[in-house]
């Protein structure tokens, strides 16, 4: 049951804040599909969002067991071994990257109706070390029953995060440039996900 959450997440409440912005174009007048968070300060929704993010790293029962085995409280274990911290080398970058990737995974799954494996942050070798390969993979089957079809979709997603909007144009260009690498990386990422999902007990999805 816990590993099932790593592949198929419950819809977090904050997703209702995601709205599409119309009429956005890039420098060359190329239209862009843009979304923004139209949020309000709501502690219950923010707490639910935080729990949603944490479950990408470690499911509930596994967290309690790991903390107990290390003779730490749950909060101590998360800070020391799981969640990137701002005072650590590469911690802020790792945390920004993780949250951005989870946000885009939620967009593709809950707004655009793709299936998105949730295993990248799970049990990685270092909490401040992002996994290599394609940032996010999303897919959608055309036929019922997931029978192979020529109209099946596989999307390789390159995620870039920026704290300021001043260099948004450069970030978009960088994402386009780096996305071309995914033609080479996506097959390796698919194989990595297949093996990791099998390790997590999700042989059918793998």
Model-inferred region functions:
Residues 165-206:
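Acidic, metal/cofactor-coordinating or nucleic-acid-engaging core segments within structured domains
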Residues 1-75, 82-86:
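Nuclease-adjacent, charged terminal/linker segments that flank catalytic cores
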């Amino acid at each position: 049951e816990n590993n099932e959450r790593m592949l198929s997440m419950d819809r977090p409440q904050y997703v209702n804040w995601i709205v599409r912005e119309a009429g956005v174009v890039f420098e060359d007048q190329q239209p862009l599909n843009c979304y923004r968070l139209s949020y309000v300060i709501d502690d219950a929704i923010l707490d639910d969002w935080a729990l949603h993010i944490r479950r990408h790293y470690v499911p509930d029962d596994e967290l309690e067991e790991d903390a107990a085995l290390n003779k730490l409280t749950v909060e101590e274990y998360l800070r020391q071994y799981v969640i990137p911290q701002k005072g650590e080398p590469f911690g802020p970058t790792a945390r920004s990257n993780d949250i951005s990737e989870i946000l885009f995974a939620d967009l593709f799954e809950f707004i655009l109706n793709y299936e998105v494996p949730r295993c990248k942050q799970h049990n990685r070798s270092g909490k401040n070390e992002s996994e290599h390969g394609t940032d996010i993979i999303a897919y959608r089957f055309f036929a019922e029953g997931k029978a192979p079809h020529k109209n099946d979709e596989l999307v390789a997603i390159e995620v870039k995060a920026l704290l300021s909007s001043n260099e948004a144009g450069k970030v978009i260009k960088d994402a386009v440039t780096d996305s071309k690498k995914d033609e080479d990386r996506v097959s390796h990422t698919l194989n990595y996900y297949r093996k990791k999902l099998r390790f997590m007990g999700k042989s059918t999805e793998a």
